[in-house]
Amino acid sequence: MIYRIAFLFLSLIIFQCRPKEAPKEFSFKKKEKESLRKASVFVDLKNKGVGPVSSIVLEEVIDSVLVRKGEAIYKEKCTVCHKIGSKFIGPSPNGILKRRSPEWVMNMILNTDEMLQKDSLAKALFMEFDGQLMVNQKLNEEEARAILEYFRALE
C-alpha cells in the first residue's frame, strides 16, 4: 500500500515539474484575403446572370414612386432573410449594385432556382450563406424592377 502511495506521489511530482508551454495567442482579426474570397463582397459587374433580363437601362435620376413600391415589396417578401445594412440569413442589399449588374440582381429575384443551378456567383453565395436557398417569391418583372430601384436608393 505504501508503494502505491509513493508511486502516486512521484507521478504527480514528475508531471507537475515539466516545463509549461506558453499560452497560444488568439487573434480575432479578420483576414483580408478571406474576405476577398467571399462571394458577397466579390465584384462582378459583367455577369448578367441567367433569366429573362438580358439588358436594362437605369435612368440617372432615381424614381421615388418606384422606390416606395419596391420598398413595400421588399419589406413584405424579403425581410425574413435580408436585412438592410447587415448580413442575416442572406446578404444585405446595401451596395449590391456596386458589386452586381442590375440584370444579375433582377434575374436573381425573378429566376432564383435556375440562377442557383447555373450561375457560378449565385452558387458561391449559396455556399457562403450555409446552403440557405433563396426562396423564389414568384415576382413579376415590374415588381423586381421596383425592388431594384429601392436598392439603388439604398446606395
Sequence positions of predicted segments:
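Gly/Gly-Pro-rich "capping" loops immediately C-terminal to redox-active cysteine motifs
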Residues: 71, 83-111
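Electrostatic cytochrome c docking/interface patches
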Residues: 30-73
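Bacterial signal peptide processing site
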Residues: 17-20
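Intrinsically disordered, low-complexity segments enriched in small/polar and acidic residues
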Residues: 25-29
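Axial heme c-ligation environment in periplasmic c-type cytochrome domains
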Residues: 89-96, 114-143
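The canonical Cys-X-X-Cys-His
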Residues: 70, 74-85, 105, 134, ...
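C-terminal capping alpha-helices of c-type cytochrome domains
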Residues: 103-108, 131-155
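Sec-dependent bacterial lipoprotein signal peptides
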Residues: 1-15
